[in-house]
Amino acid sequence: MTLGQQAESLAQGYLEQQGLTFVERNVRYPFGEIDLIMRHKHHWVFVEVKYRSANQFGGAIQALSKAQIGRIRMAASHYLQTHKLDVPCRFDVVAIEDAQIHWLVDAF
């Protein structure tokens, strides 16, 4: 298992402990990828997982570029359309740094 996969598993477990329900993982399209798809009450939650062993380069949260946010949004829109879902959604980030988990709800 790669470090990225380990981080995603850790994030998934953490979010489940917080009351979210797992739906799908690593949804890939030619134009973007979604790390985790979860449900929280009536919202579908598209989660980007960022891992850094140290924050010497600005940390995990700062590693998310505008271009990457655009690709995640496009992938989420495509997912909702292909699954015929007309539901409220949000975009969260789970940042894992130095064995600490930071959950940013509605991050972008």
Swiss-Prot record:
It comes from Shewanella sp. (strain MR-4). InterPro entries: Restrct_endonuc-II-like, tRNA_endonuc-like_dom_sf, UPF0102_YraN-like. NCBIfam families: PRK12497.1-3, YraN family protein. PANTHER family: UPF0102 PROTEIN YRAN. Belongs to the UPF0102 family. GO terms for molecular function: nucleic acid binding. Pfam families: UPF0102. This is UPF0102 protein Shewmr4_3685.
